[in-house]
C-alpha cells in the first residue's frame, strides 16, 4: 500500500519480470528490504512456476574438476546468484552420459530455472537438450550456431595473437603452438588467434610445430618433447592452457633446456602454479570469479525474458609478463 501499486505489480517487480520498469523494481525491492520482507520460496515456486535457483552441473571426470580455478568460479556463481535473489544448485556427473542424465533429472524435477554451462563444446549435447526443452541457459564460451544462446567468454583468440606478437618482438621466428582439447569451442578460437598472430608478424605457420588436444601437465610434457626433439625445434612455444605450459617446463628440464633463455613459453589462464614456477610463467590471466558473477547475472536476465542476442558478452584476459619469455638467442 505504501507504494500505491497493485499486488500483482509488486509481485512481478520482486520476481524481475521485464514488463516492470527497472525504477519500479528498485522501489519495490528497497521497500521490501526496509520491511525485512522475504517471500516464502516454496510458496513462490508454486505461484510463479519458478524455483529461484540457478543450476550448475560439474563433470567430475573433466580435467578441470580439481583445478584451483573452480573454487573461484563457483564463488563467483554463488555471489552472482545471491545478488540477483537466487540460490545456486550444484550437481555432479562422472561421465558425459551421466552428465546428460543428470540434466534430464534436474529438468524433470524442476530443480532450477536455468543453467550455467561451463566450457562450451563445439558440438554440445547440453545446448541441444536445453534448447529443445526451452529452458534458459548461459554458456561460458561461444557457439557457432548462436540460436537461443546467451554467453560470456574471454577472448582467448586475442590473447594467442598477442602472445605471438610478444614473442616476435623478442626475435622469435620458430614458434610452436600446443592447443587444447579440440572438442571445446575455445580451442578453435585460440588456434585462429595463433594463426592470426603469425600472419600479423609476417611468419608462416609450420604444421610440424603444432600440437592439438593437450589439456593436462602430462599432455604438455609429451607434446613439448615431440617439438623439442625435432631437427629444427621451436625457440618459443605458445600454450592454450597453463597446465600444458607447465608440462613444457618438465619436457625442457628432461632435455636440459633452460626456460626463459633457450626456450620461451607463454601460457593462458593465470593459475597460481604458474606464478610459482621457476621461472614464473608469462601468461594471460582470467578473473574466474568475475566470470562467475557475470554468467549468473546474464542467466537471470535470460530467465526474465530478455532476448538471448542481447545477452552475449566477451572480455579480455590480462597479459602478465614474467620470466619464461626472453630474447631469442638462436638467431
Question: What does each model-found stretch correspond to?
Answer:
Residues 26, 35-102, 199:
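Amphipathic helical "hinge" segments at domain boundaries
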Amino acid at each position: 500500500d505504501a507504494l500505491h501499486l497493485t499486488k500483482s505489480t509488486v509481485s512481478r517487480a520482486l520476481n524481475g519480470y521485464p514488463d516492470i520498469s527497472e525504477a519500479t523494481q528498485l522501489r519495490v525491492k528497497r521497500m521490501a528490504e526496509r520491511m525485512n520482507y522475504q517471500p516464502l520460496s516454496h510458496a513462490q515456486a508454486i505461484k510463479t512456476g519458478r524455483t529461484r535457483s540457478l543450476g550448475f552441473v560439474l563433470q567430475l571426470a573433466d580435467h578441470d574438476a580439481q583445478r584451483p580455478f573452480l573454487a573461484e568460479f563457483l564463488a563467483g556463481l554463488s555471489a552472482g546468484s545471491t545478488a540477483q535473489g537466487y540460490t545456486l544448485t550444484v550437481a555432479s556427473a562422472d561421465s558425459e552420459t551421466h552428465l546428460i542424465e543428470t540434466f534430464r533429472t534436474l529438468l524433470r524435477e524442476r530443480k532450477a530455472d536455468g543453467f550455467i554451462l561451463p566450457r562450451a563444446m563445439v558440438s554440445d549435447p547440453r545446448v541441444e537438450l536445453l534448447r529443445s526443452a526451452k529452458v534458459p541457459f548461459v554458456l561460458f564460451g561461444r557457439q557457432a550456431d548462436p540460436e537461443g544462446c546467451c554467453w560470456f567468454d574471454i577472448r582467448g583468440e586475442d590473447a594467442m595473437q598477442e602472445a605471438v606478437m610478444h614473442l616476435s618482438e623478442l626475435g622469435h621466428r620458430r614458434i610452436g603452438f600446443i592447443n587444447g582439447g579440440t572438442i571445446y569451442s575455445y580451442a578453435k578460437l585460440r588456434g585462429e588467434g595463433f594463426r592470426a598472430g603469425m600472419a600479423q608478424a609476417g611468419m608462416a605457420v609450420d604444421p610440424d610445430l603444432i600440437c592439438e588436444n593437450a589439456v593436462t601437465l602430462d599432455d604438455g610434457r609429451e607434446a613439448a618433447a615431440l617439438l623439442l626433439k625435432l631437427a629444427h625445434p621451436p625457440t618459443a612455444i605458445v600454450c592454450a592452457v597453463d597446465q600444458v605450459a607447465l608440462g613444457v617446463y618438465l619436457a625442457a628440464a628432461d632435455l636440459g633446456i633452460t626456460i626463459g633463455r633457450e626456450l620461451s613459453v607463454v601460457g593462458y589462464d593465470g593459475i597460481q602454479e604458474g606464478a610459482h614456477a621457476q621461472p614464473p610463467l608469462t601468461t594471460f590471466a582470467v578473473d574466474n570469479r568475475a566470470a562467475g558473477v557475470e554468467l549468473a547475472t546474464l542467466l537471470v536476465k535470460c530467465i526474465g525474458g530478455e532476448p538471448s542476442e542481447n545477452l552475449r558478452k566477451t572480455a579480455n584476459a590480462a597479459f602478465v609478463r614474467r620470466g619464461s619469455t626472453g630474447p631469442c638467442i638462436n638467431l
